[in-house]
């Protein structure tokens, strides 16, 4: 068991080093996926021996270990193949070759520089869905790896694979899921594509109009789409979105009374007129809460950065447990579309926080925001 623990530690140290180095070379990402593969092999072997924990890490079931190892092998082999081409000299981030990107449509391809477009179903702006158009798609075909752009037309989003169009998003299928009338509009920056009548009423195989192809320029900044009249806009529009039913019953008066009383009780416990209120993370105002006649505030540090780097830092912080009281898991704000996440570190006093910041090495790519919180469980 000790041998397995040592091998697991070695694999995880290598993985963390790859996160911290933030390399843009394919050969370094091959090393990362080899380490992930070996990590899951060690966990698989441990589970075979009925070991459910290696030190503090829970060992997943055999099926999970096997599935993760297979994904690591698949991506590692694809990268080793791509490394033999002229594309190896390009910049490749760990995000470009991560598992999520590999399984994002079009699957089993590498992709770069995605830009979002909007598709309005039934001509309604409030019934819209976002899709990604990739500036470059790298696929392995009959002649090895090829780099092509993805393209938008009224049928969907596609790329050309060995001379054939491969649609990885079909707007006709999406209209069945999200709309009622089978019509849609595609909005890309200040350009729009409208669905012909023949497409909205028949399957794509029966369509023979002149194709209007727009190759989306992914370097353009996204602008507000222009207002336009959709195909079939004069038809009666449905008032509800698919899968949602309007609420027709009035809330129980007893529940309403209870909710009002609870809100009033909470408002009485929070003193919003206190002059010590501060501006906190995300632009919200932090209020000092009065508890037993005094203000109980706890010093904290919010760390902002890419999720993998934050997880790496949190792992490293376990060596300095004496310098903080608690540390959160990785989280993000739900009302923003950003790739950054946060972790929060709680301290018993200002001195402990200062010691933490002096001792723990925090990478420059992670932003440090200091503040205070109330009502924190110590």
UniProtKB/Swiss-Prot annotation:
It holds the Pfam family PPV_E2_N. It comes from the Viruses. One of its GO terms (biological process) is DNA-templated transcription. One of its GO terms (molecular function) is DNA binding. Binds DNA as homodimer. Interacts with protein E1; this interaction greatly increases E1 DNA-binding activity. Interacts with protein L1; this interaction enhances E2-dependent replication and transcription activation. Interacts with protein L2; this interaction inhibits E2 transcriptional activity but not DNA replication function E2. Interacts with protein E7; this interaction inhibits E7 oncogenic activity. Interacts with host TAF1; this interaction modulates E2-dependent transcriptional regulation. Interacts with host BRD4; this interaction mediates E2 transcriptional activation function. Belongs to the papillomaviridae E2 protein family. This is Regulatory protein E2. The gene is E2.
